[in-house]
């Protein structure tokens, strides 16, 4: 429940930030335009983001004939989660990772790299796919799509404010120093809010995945393995499309310093500790 409240508050914050920037650029009219612009971008993302992401990763759809063990595993977990059967995809990549996409449970897809299938045991793989189906059940793909779109739009509006200035309610030019400050600080604030939402949803998907599979320890050991293997294997498609990093079960981007501050995922150690506590107590709340 705490993660859901936190997510709602953060989404309200990123929406408010977007509208405030619109107001700084063009007063009440600017706020209205900013809101309409955000709605248009979210509409496009809602309907087409899954196709775009699967194409970016050159994901190939599989069925029971082409990937019988993997497909049956997803079907069994979807049944346990009371979800429609999602489309199932494989990505020919050595880096171990997986993600879910789709605008709702009826139009969902799950994808895994060939690398993760080689690295993990069947039990661990069940834990991973249960995590992805938890994202589907919680409609996290919609949440992440909206926040990513809003964060990108905030950055675009902030740049517009810096280069073209803005107007107050009376039509007078806005303070240029304020425009520069907005251009520098607003994208950072938007990105931080986006990352906080993503981290909250990852914790919730870990918990939900543990409930679906009934085996939190399997997901814990899977996360440990993915973390260790992924550190030495570049995920080229993810590096080329860093905005999609938040979709993955493990952050696929390499680097440290500021990149850790803007990480889309919680610390792996903390995720594992929470899952092991679930395994010890048998409680998923």
From Swiss-Prot:
Where does the UniProt annotation locate this protein? Cell inner membrane
Entry annotated with the keyword Transmembrane: yes
CDD domains the record matches: M48B_HtpX_like
Q: How does it sit in the membrane?
A: Multi-pass membrane protein
Q: Which Pfam family, an example, fits this chain?
A: Peptidase_M48
Q: Which GO terms describe its biological process?
A: proteolysis
Cofactor(s) for this UniProt protein = Zn(2+)
Listed EC numbers = 3.4.24.-
Active site annotation, chain numbering = 132
GO MF, one term, reads: zinc ion binding
Give the top-rank taxon of the lineage listed in the UniProt record for this protein. Answer: Bacteria
**Binding of Zn(2+): at which residues?**
131, 135, 202
A single Gene Ontology CC term: plasma membrane
Recorded family membership: Belongs to the peptidase M48B family.
Q: What is this protein called?
A: Protease HtpX homolog
Source organism per entry reads Burkholderia vietnamiensis (strain G4 / LMG 22486) (Burkholderia cepacia (strain R1808))
